[in-house]
């Protein structure tokens, strides 16, 4: 059976882009790394793959790199028309606000 784009997880970061089966394995494998962001292309879900951040938050030592990189990927994915996309400025802003409102 062939996999659709919706079943793939695109992984970027310190390593070359890797396509993984959409079985949830990718985020678990990279959770230990803490600075890898990934994007599930099928539904536009952006993950920061750093589960340990919740444990480190009270100590004020959590590394925000993965969260920032995932945010950059989201902004790149939500292209406005001047960047080759179809979103208006308002569409783009509302999408970002919506994502911030629903972590």
Swiss-Prot record:
GO cellular component, one term: mitochondrion
Keyword Nucleotide-binding included in the entry's annotation: no
A biological process term (GO) from this entry: tricarboxylic acid cycle
GO molecular function: enzyme activator activity
UniProt keywords, alphabetically: Mitochondrion, Tricarboxylic acid cycle
Means of activity regulation: The heterotetramer and the heterodimer composed of IDH3A and IDH3G subunits can be allosterically activated by citrate (CIT) or/and ADP, and the two activators can act independently or synergistically. The heterodimer composed of IDH3A and IDH3B subunits cannot be allosterically regulated and the allosteric regulation of the heterotetramer is through the IDH3G subunit and not the IDH3B subunit.
UniProt subcellular location: Mitochondrion
SUPFAM superfamilies the UniProt entry points to: Isocitrate/Isopropylmalate dehydrogenase-like
Record PANTHER family: DECARBOXYLATING DEHYDROGENASES-ISOCITRATE, ISOPROPYLMALATE, TARTRATE (PTHR11835), ISOCITRATE DEHYDROGENASE [NAD] SUBUNIT, MITOCHONDRIAL (PTHR11835:SF60)
Similarity annotation: Belongs to the isocitrate and isopropylmalate dehydrogenases family.
Its biological purpose: Plays a structural role to facilitate the assembly and ensure the full activity of the enzyme catalyzing the decarboxylation of isocitrate (ICT) into alpha-ketoglutarate. The heterodimer composed of the alpha (IDH3A) and beta (IDH3B) subunits and the heterodimer composed of the alpha (IDH3A) and gamma (IDH3G) subunits, have considerable basal activity but the full activity of the heterotetramer (containing two subunits of IDH3A, one of IDH3B and one of IDH3G) requires the assembly and cooperative function of both heterodimers.
Oligomeric form and interacting partners: Heterooligomer of subunits alpha (IDH3A), beta (IDH3B), and gamma (IDH3G) in the apparent ratio of 2:1:1. The heterodimer containing one IDH3A and one IDH3B subunit and the heterodimer containing one IDH3A and one IDH3G subunit assemble into a heterotetramer (which contains two subunits of IDH3A, one of IDH3B and one of IDH3G) and further into the heterooctamer.
Protein name: Isocitrate dehydrogenase [NAD] subunit beta, mitochondrial
Organism: Sus scrofa
């Amino acid at each position: 059976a062939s996999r659709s784009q919706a079943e793939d997880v695109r992984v970027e970061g310190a390593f070359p882009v890797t396509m993984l089966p959409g079985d949830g394995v990718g985020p678990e494998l990279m959770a230990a790394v803490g600075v890898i962001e990934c994007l599930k292309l099928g539904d536009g879900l952006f993950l920061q793959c750093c589960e340990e951040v919740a444990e480190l938050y009270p100590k004020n030592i959590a590394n925000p790199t993965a969260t920032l990189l995932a945010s950059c990927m989201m902004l790149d994915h939500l292209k406005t028309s001047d960047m080759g996309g179809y979103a208006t400025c308002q569409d783009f802003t509302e999408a970002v606000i919506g994502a911030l409102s629903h972590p």
